[in-house]
Amino acid sequence: MLEFLRKKKIQVPDNYKNLIGQSDYEIFVNQCLNVLKDLGVNVISYENGDITYKGKNEDGHYFLDNLVRKYVQVDKENQLTEIKDHFKKLQETPYAYDYLFKDFDYAKQFLKVLIKPTDITPKIDDFVTRIDYPDLLTVLVLDFEDRFHYIRKDEAILWEVDFEELFKIALVNISQENVEIRKHLFDDKFDVYVLLSGDFSASFSLLIDTHMDFAIGEYGSLIGIPTKGTVFIHPITTNDFMDLTSTLYNEMERFYNEDPSNISMDLYWFDKKVLKLFNKTWNDNGTITISMPDELKKIVNE
């Protein structure tokens, strides 16, 4: 184990706890560090799913959220191989990003956004992000060579393009992704549109006002984004739509616990302009009470 870890206990990040136990996570992190050492990577620190290493010109980061989800899905005898393959692939094009940040006209085709929990890394302020869903981050990334590169602010400024313009371009690219939209009837009464894709359903939901007007009801939309690849949207047209939340929450929970790329168990209201959070209360008996935002409650009861 590296010297800095001898003084600091490895803890499972909260957003990994439904995937992996404490002892297995310690094994996982140590395997990652040993593989990186064998590859000649100069690791500086580890914290909360983020391995910081000494790069050519500045410190770099390996975020473990995708790797840990792949790791737990393979047989134990193949887990170390999964780690080796992952980090070897990251070493194959170490200088490609230097070129991308020097040629915006070429790089812009790879711009995308991902929706992520706010605790994805303790150093998230170093990266280009914005907030669309309350309590979540919209993160600007390069989708290049079958991996996502989280774009740091010091990298993005090399393009000399306003950050909001970068997000606009990224969302145009997201609109070109192949996202399947299925219409289901929940509780024999409520229309629910389910967005399915490998990586970009949650990101695609940000385009609801321009690409999914059919999913917007008189009172807006009820949205759940349990994982990056699965989104639930109900067009709110009646004042009894809260009857849907129990069934919807249970369905979201199933995806959240089974899918390797979970995001949130919160529900959101798209009010035809912005996204707002439904209230959630944990009761003493272990149940959860979900209630409408005050603004929504007012308009549906008029």
Predicted regions and their residues:
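N-terminal alpha-helical "arm" segments
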Residues: M1-S45
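Short glycine-rich, basic-tinged beta-strand/loop micro-motifs
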Residues: I10-N15, D50-I51, F190, I225-P235
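Conserved catalytic core of nucleotide polymerization and phosphodiester-bond processing enzymes
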Residues: L19, S23, D50, V274
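Well-ordered, non-membrane alpha-helical segments in soluble/globular domains
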Residues: D24-V29, S201-D213, F241-E253
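Charged, alpha-helical interface segments at or near domain boundaries
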Residues: Q31-V35, L39, I44-G198
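Short beta-strand
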Residues: V43-Y46, L222-P226
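Aromatic/basic-lined ligand-recognition segments
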Residues: V179, K189-A215, Y219
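C-terminal structured domains
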Residues: T227-E302
